[in-house]
Amino acid sequence: WNVIALDLPGHGRSEGPALESIEAMASWTIEIIDTLGLNSIALIGHSMGSLITLETASRLSDRVTHAVLIGSISPMPVSEPILDATANKPGAAHSMLTSFGFSKQNLMGGNPNPGMWMVSDSMRRYEDEAQSALDSDMRACNAYQRGLEAASEIAAPTLMLHGDADRLTPLRATKPLLDALSNARMDIIPGSGHSLMVEDPNHVLDQLKIHLL
C-alpha cells in the first residue's frame, strides 16, 4: 500500500482557512484523490475523519475498495459545553476533549508505546491547532446530518473500530450507522476510549491488516 495522510486546510502543514462542513472536506479530499489520479483507494478516518470518509466514499462509489471508520457514530452531536469552550475557552476545550478522549483507565497512566504519555501528547496536539480550526471542526461534526444516507450508498467492505469505553462517541450509539452500512463488520476494543490509535495501537494495526490485506 502507498499511504497518503492528509492535513486538511488550516491543519498541520496545510495552509488556508479551515473548511466549515463535512461536505466541503469531502470535496477537498476528492480533489486531492483526482489530482493524484487514484482509482483504487481505501479510505480510513477517525472521529471527524470518519464522517469525511463516509461522505467521500459515498461519492466515489466503486473507486473505493475498502473503508474504515474509527470511533464513528452518525449523527455525531457535540455538546454545548464543548462548543462553548472551543469558541471561547480554548484551554478548557483542550482539557475537556483530552479528558473525554481516553478511557478512565488510560487517563490514569500507562502507555503501550514506551516513552510516551498519552494525555500530555493529546494536550500538546490540541494546543498546536488553531483555535478557529478546532471550533470549526466541532461545529462541522455537530451539523453533519447526511451520515446514514451516505453509509447506505457505500458498497465497499467497511470496518468499524470502536472502544468499549468511548465517552465521546459511545459504543451504544453505533448501531444506526452499523445498520445503514450494507457490508460492514464491527470490532470492539476492550478498555479503549475514543483515542484508539494510541490507547491500543497494536489492536488497531492488526485489524487494519485483516481488513485491507
Task: Tell where the protein language model's regions lie, with residue ranges.
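Catalytic active-site module of serine/aspartate enzymes centered on a nucleophile-bearing elbow/loop
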Residues: 184-213
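Alpha/beta-hydrolase active-site loop signature
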Residues: 8-12, 74, 193-196
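Conserved catalytic-core motifs of eukaryotic protein kinase domains, centered on the activation segment
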Residues: 14-19, 78-80, 171-172
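Short alpha-helix in the alpha/beta-hydrolase fold that links the catalytic acid
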Residues: 156, 170-179
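Flexible "cap/lid" loop of the alpha/beta hydrolase fold
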Residues: 51-97
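Active-site loop/oxyanion-hole signature of alpha/beta-hydrolase fold enzymes
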Residues: 1-44, 48, 206
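Conserved alpha/beta-hydrolase catalytic His-Asp/Glu region
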Residues: 84-153
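Short beta-strand/loop motif that positions the catalytic acidic residue
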Residues: 154, 160-162, 166
